[in-house]
């Protein structure tokens, strides 16, 4: 959500992950709640978002959240494995400097899923 402060704060973390792991198969996909295409385009430019962003109505996004474990926090992060199942999820911002263990857990799960040694 473009109005979400913690969402904005975690963009550099996801940009870093996208840069480090995209060529190995990771695809970061942001999903924004209640924004239109123009708002999202301006947001991604202003905040230098280096990964694709989707947008949708709160109703559509709530359905997605329900389908992916019933988590309704903004932000929420999900690591979806190659088989389409959720292998890791976290309700809240993932900020390396604030919570290094959560960031390390995510990196570990990414590397495990991508089979990186």
Model regions: which residues?
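Conserved redox-active cysteine motifs that mediate thiol-disulfide chemistry
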Residues: 1-16
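Short strand-loop junctions, especially beta-strand C-caps/beta-turns
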Residues: 2, 31, 92-93
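Extracytoplasmic/periplasmic, Sec-exported soluble proteins
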Residues: 6-9, 32-35, 72, 98, ...
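Conserved segment of the thioredoxin-like fold in thiol-based oxidoreductases
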Residues: 16-60
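Thiol/disulfide oxidoreductase modules built on the thioredoxin-like
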Residues: 46-49, 56-109
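Non-globular targeting/processing and membrane-anchoring segments
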Residues: 110-117
């Amino acid at each position: 959500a473009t109005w979400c402060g913690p969402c904005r704060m975690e963009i550099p973390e996801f940009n870093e992950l996208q840069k480090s792991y995209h060529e190995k198969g990771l695809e970061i996909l942001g999903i924004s709640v209640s924004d239109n295409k123009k708002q999202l385009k301006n947001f991604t430019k202003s905040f230098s978002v280096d990964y694709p962003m989707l947008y949708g109505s709160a109703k559509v996004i709530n359905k997605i959240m329900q389908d992916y474990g019933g988590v309704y926090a903004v932000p929420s992060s999900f690591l979806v494995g190659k088989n389409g199942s959720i292998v890791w999820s976290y309700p809240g911002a993932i900020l390396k400097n604030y919570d290094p263990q959560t960031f390390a857990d995510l990196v570990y799960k990414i590397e495990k899923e991508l089979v990186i040694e």
